[in-house]
Swiss-Prot record:
InterPro entries: AB_hydrolase_fold, ACP-like_sf, AMP-bd_C_sf, AMP-binding_CS, AMP-dep_synth/lig_dom, ANL_N_sf, ATP-dep_AMP-bd_enzyme, PKS_PP-bd. One of its GO terms (molecular function) is phosphopantetheine binding. Residues 592-670 form the Carrier domain. GO terms for biological process: biosynthetic process. Keywords: Phosphopantetheine, Phosphoprotein, Transferase. This is Inactive atromentin synthetase invA4. It comes from Paxillus involutus. Inactive atromentin synthetase homolog. Does not accept 4-hydroxyphenylpyruvate (4-HPP) as substrate.
Length: 950
């Protein structure tokens, strides 16, 4: 067959001007600002609607005219910053309206907005990224909110402006000012790449590229001034800002922008909004289609209840769309629709940040036709775009129709360059202006479909993760030969999202007597590292001989070669051998589920850990297997549902981490034979290892879930026990004094570990409890060799009333923002406590309530337990001393880290008989042990234990 290159003819309006520079002169009236002004002039009463992250059930509306006045006032206020025209403004905001306003205000003021995605919670990565951005733009002007400013406040040299302050200034200015008049090829908006293969690149889009792409998309979508679209994608992504805002703005269409949390937490809201607002166009990537289908397909009580007649098109992209997923979703919509004959048109597409969102589309009625492939085709280019398939080795030789190769595109919507990065820009294009997408595609029978990626990333639910970074961490696993490991992106047949395969050479002989046990441990570790880094285990782990893992002359392993061998079945004998050895290892300690309860629990385990039920032994420890605090809540929730139980106390999940013991406990609940257990503060989070155990005291909220992720790092090293406050279970009274609590905890520790030396630590207010317990043990004649204080001070505990305690707990649980804890207190205090609970409840993200399995009653009970502990804190003053202290400190809730350390943390010196060790740890007070920070915290914490001879 002949080589293929496909071109779509451009429409003869805006695109004609944009593609031919001789017509697009400096006097040309076509820029983004003209488009905005035209929309306001022609459709003054059309609407921009917003649903925010904190108010899922209410819609905030501005007409085009009102929004125009708002952003022009912001632009006038921006000019007071005194920045020269063309300055880059890093926009770091979370709400759609705020991002939208920041973009247009920047453009009117003559600045270039750069949309910053959510920053990493890992301090080192965040600081490195911000420093990179500062150097890239040779400036450091940020427009953000209070939360964003808090995240970057520790990074020097930034010129940070708060949106709230800009809004206040805008209220006092006149909007009658001369707005900036850009040229067609001026930089308009910058977008940051994911940084999946290193630091982010800044993609430069000009007025020309944006208008070319948006005009072509608008025609492809069939938008008119009467259209209504719904978007939930953030504005830091080109789909949200260009595809679902500027594109409909070109034709004056009204828009509804919904914060992602509102859709992801409540699938029904997706349908209600389509019905309520008569939405015609929505965007739903493959992972959302799958989620909506899972949530809604069994809701037979809702069949025929929704008027979905307005919806004309469902766009999908970001990752390949599984044909069966699209069909299942369409069937679900049809069942839910009032019109039983309704059909739903899917438009699968391909686009990148560099192409300004979608540039290749296909429309298909997935129920009216049978898709010929596992993944839906992505079709043909939009007007003005060209695409071709070439040999990926040389990047220029066209591939015949039906053969796979590298997808390349060109056209007026393709970005002009990477900001201040000419080398990468040059390498991204080949002769003729073709952009190398890094994707593998096949053009056949007039349609394009994707079949993989060339670049070193794996896409999980639309999010790109860097393969090199993943390999770096996997390489550290014991049992992996140094520099003989690669991970390759791979999408197995039937999978809804992309995954990966790990190839490696083991350090041990697979024919040795202990090979089964070593292989099992190595594969378990590789899986655990993968889940922690990219939330997904490998689809296959394949141990190979060194000869099979051949390297190039430059010492590189070929992912493509190994993946091809795997796909062709050439590695089958290695996979079979590994399974035989793993089977031997599992068989040595494997106990298959026997009772119906055990089988049901094994099924829940398998679902959580992405395994087959046949791989689950009843002797497996849930937390040693990789279970997190969120997994524990999921286990609790699914078990309650499976066994029709109103409550399985969280503490029992910790006390019965093996299926065999949890099944017996569940059976006792079902038969109502469960006896009331005597309170024991000790919660064993992991019991392996021979080194001195660590006892970790709960923070002020009394619960120990925060320690689950940390405990896993002590497997096979030392037992890890947490101490949980009294009062959580029915009939348990709260402690009445700190002395009573300390006496109880000291006795429990002695009962668990009769003889010293002891290692005790506490987080937040748990730090002072740990200090008091250590003192008590020393009075009892025991040696306490390690007393850890994690981000707490020894004097004048912060005093807060009941309302403050409720808000602090709610913030700790992720129900409200830090700003809410300050802003809400004055208005809440006069209210009755029930009304205060209801106010917090309305602000709480529904998905977080589901995640925590929280009800109003449970929250009230939790507040009462925390309030009893808070009463101790109000009266506390440290006295006396212990033999030695290790004090860990992070970014404080208020003030600077420097002040926190010098004027508060260092006062612990008065209460240690030896010079304390002060350790700076990454993160904020409330995040230092979260998923992102715990890998670094555990290294620091374990190093201090070892330094103390433990």
């Amino acid at each position: 067959m002949n080589p293929v290159a496909v071109t779509s003819v451009a429409p003869v309006d805006i695109i004609h001007d944009l593609r031919h520079s001789e017509h697009a002169t400096e006097a040309s009236p076509i820029t983004l600002l003209h488009v905005f002004s035209r929309a306001v002039s022609q459709y003054p009463n059309h609407e921009l609607n917003f649903i925010t992250s904190s108010a899922h059930d209410s819609i905030h509306t501005k007409t085009f005219t009102e929004f125009d006045q708002y952003v022009r006032a912001l632009a006038q206020a921006m000019l007071a910053w005194g920045k020269p025209a063309g300055s880059v403004i890093v926009v770091y905001l979370t709400e759609h309206e705020d991002n939208m306003a920041a973009i247009w205000a920047s453009l009117f003021a003559g600045y270039v907005p750069c949309l910053q995605p959510a920053l990493s919670a890992q301090q080192a990565h965040k600081e490195g990224h911000v420093a990179h951005i500062k150097n890239l733009f040779s400036s450091a002007t940020w427009l953000t909110n209070e939360s964003g400013a808090e995240q970057v406040q520790s990074i020097p040299g930034l010129d940070i402006h708060l949106l709230s302050e800009l809004q206040a200034s805008a209220e006092t200015v006149s909007v009658d000012f001369q707005t900036h008049q850009p040229h067609l090829d001026d930089e308009a908006i910058l977008f940051l790449t994911s940084g999946s293969t290193g630091f982010s690149k800044a993609v430069v889009h000009t007025h020309r590229t944006i208008l070319a792409g948006c005009n072509a998309k608008g025609q492809s979508y069939g938008l008119t001034s009467e259209s209504k679209i719904m978007n939930w994608v953030g504005f830091d992504h080109v789909v949200g800002s260009l595809g679902m805002h500027i594109t409909p703005l070109l034709c004056g269409a009204s828009q509804l922008h919904v914060h992602a949390s509102a859709i992801l937490s409540d699938s029904l809201r997706f349908l209600h909004l389509i019905e309520e607002k008569s939405i015609q166009l929505v965007f739903a990537p493959n992972f959302l289609l799958a989620k909506l289908t899972r949530d809604l397909e069994k809701r037979s009580d809702l069949f025929g209840k929704f008027d979905l007649s307005s919806i004309k098109r469902i766009n999908s992209g970001g990752e390949a769309v599984v044909s069966s997923t699209a069909q299942a979703f369409a069937r679900t919509l049809k069942n839910l629709a009032k019109d039983g004959d309704a059909s739903f048109v899917f438009s699968t597409g391909f686009g990148m940040t560099e192409t300004g969102a979608g540039c290749i589309y296909d429309t298909i009625d997935v129920l009216g036709t049978s898709p010929p492939h596992e993944f839906l085709e992505i079709g043909t280019p939009v007007a003005g775009c060209e695409m071709r398939i070439v040999n990926p080795e040389d990047g220029v030789t066209p591939r015949p129709d039906g053969e796979s190769g590298e997808l390349q595109v060109r056209g007026p919507m393709v970005f002009v360059r990477y900001y201040n990065n000419p080398e990468t820009t040059s390498s991204s294009f080949v002769e003729g202006g073709w952009y190398r997408t890094g994707d593998v595609g096949i053009f056949e029978k007039g349609k394009m479909r994707l079949s993989g990626r060339i670049k070193d990333t794996v896409v999980v639910h639309g999010v790109s993760y860097g393969i090199p970074e993943l390999e770096t961490y996997l390489q550290t696993v014991e049992g992996v030969a140094h520099s003989f490991l690669v991970a390759a992106p791979y999408r197995a047949p039937g999978q809804e999202t992309e995954g990966f395969v790990v190839f490696y050479s083991p350090t041990f002989d697979l024919d040795s007597e202990d090979a089964p046990a070593k292989l099992y441990a190595t594969h378990r570790a590789l899986r655990d590292v993968s889940v922690k880094l990219i939330t997904l285990p490998p689809q296959q782990i394949i141990p190979l001989t060194l000869n099979q893992m051949e390297k190039s002359t430059l010492g590189k392993l070929s992912r493509a070669r190994l993946l091809n061998l795997f796909k062709q079945g050439e590695l089958a004998k290695y996979i079979i051998r590994a399974e035989e050895l793993l089977g031997i290892a599992r068989g040595a300690n494997f106990v298959a589920p026997s009772t119906e309860t055990e089988k049901t629990l094994a099924g829940i385990y398998a679902g959580i850990f992405h395994l087959s039920v046949s791989d689950i032994s009843t002797s497996e420890n849930f937390f040693e297997f990789g279970g997190t605090s969120i997994d524990a809540i999921r286990l609790k929730r699914e078990a309650e549902s499976a066994f029709d139980l109103s409550e399985i106390p969280t503490i029992q999940i910790f006390k019965h981490p093996e299926i065999i013991t949890l099944a017996k406990y569940v059976d006792s609940l079902v038969s109502k034979d469960a006896s009331e257990e005597e309170y024991d503060p000790i919660v064993p989070l992991q019991l392996t290892g021979k080194k001195t155990p660590i006892f970790m005291v709960h923070p002020g909220i009394g619960e120990v879930l925060i320690f689950v992720n940390l405990a896993k790092y002590f497997q096979n090293e030392r037992p890890f026990y947490a101490l949980r406050a009294r009062g959580f279970e029915a009939g348990q009274p709260c402690f009445t004094s700190l002395d009573e609590m300390v006496s109880c905890y000291a006795a429990a520790i002695k009962r668990t570990q009769p003889h010293g030396p002891y290692a005790i630590a506490g987080y937040s207010y748990g730090g002072v409890i740990a200090f008091e317990v250590a003192k008590r043990l020393e009075v009892m004649g025991s040696e306490v060799q390690f007393t850890g204080i994690i981000d707490m001070i020894p004097h004048h505990m912060p005093r807060s009333d009941w309302t403050g305690g409720l808000l602090i707990l709610s913030y700790f649980l992720g129900l409200v923002s830090k700003q809410d804890t300050n802003d809400l207190a004055p208005s809440m205090r006069p209210l009755a406590r029930t009304e205060q609970f209801e106010m917090v409840w309305k602000l709480s993200p529904p998905e977080r309530l589901v995640e925590l399995q929280l009800t109003l009653e449970k929250l009230e009970h939790w507040v009462n337990v925390a309030d009893s502990v808070r009463e101790f804190a109000k009266k506390y003053e440290a006295c006396s001393s212990v033999s030695v202290l290790d004090v860990f400190y992070a970014i404080p809730v208020r003030g600077t880290k420097e002040d926190w350390f010098n004027n508060h943390i260092k006062r612990w010196a008065s209460y240690s008989r030896a010079e304390p060790s002060y350790v700076d740890v990454p993160g904020h007070h409330y995040t230092l042990m979260d998923f992102d920070h715990v890998p670094r915290f555990q290294k620091i914490f374990r190093a201090r234990l070892e330094a103390r001879g433990l």
